[in-house]
Amino acid sequence: MKKLILSFVAVALATTAFAQKKAEMMSWDEAYTKATEVLKNLSLDEKIEMTHGHNQFFLPGAPAKGLPHIFMVDASAGVRINHSLLDPNEVRHPEKTTQFPANIMLASTFNNELAKRYGEAVGWETRMAGAGVLLGPGMNIYRSSQCGRNFEYLGEDPYLAGCMVANYVTGMQSTGTMACLKHFLANNTEYLRRLSNSVVDERAIMEIYTPAFKAGID
């Protein structure tokens, strides 16, 4: 439990730059060290608050003790703003955001630099929306034409998807916005997706379904 809370605090501290004009990202080691110090000053109730979600797209912090709230926005081809869930005191939220080309179109360019610039642009719009985390990119492998979210993903090739997502995440996180890779793992149908069972052997998981996620983390 302590490691879970430490990780949350470290993430919160590492993404506090989203309201500034220029991202000032600290390293993971720096954030973890600072999180350890912040954790010492939190009450038990404050620690418990950090172990669960609070409404959608929101994780409570402890602003009085230097730990900001974490606001998240959903994404596929840009930033989806939900004004009711964002803090009106943080920044002046834009009424509209850019409709970017779908991720499958980005993958079809085979252009790593473009993927990086795409992620950077989405990252800046996330910050303009007053959020620190973008719930994206979507990156499941395109295995079935029946998947209703194929347009969000980066194609059927694990290597290409990995190259695209690695550059996308690099660009996005250079702005101070944290990427949240989704939807782990083998999410290849929208029909009853919270109830269905994906039967996949270990080799397929390791060779096809997880490489892109690993690339996004590394």
Locate the predicted segments by residue.
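Glycoside hydrolase catalytic-domain context in secreted enzymes
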Residues: 20-218
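Bacterial Sec-dependent N-terminal signal peptides
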Residues: 1-23
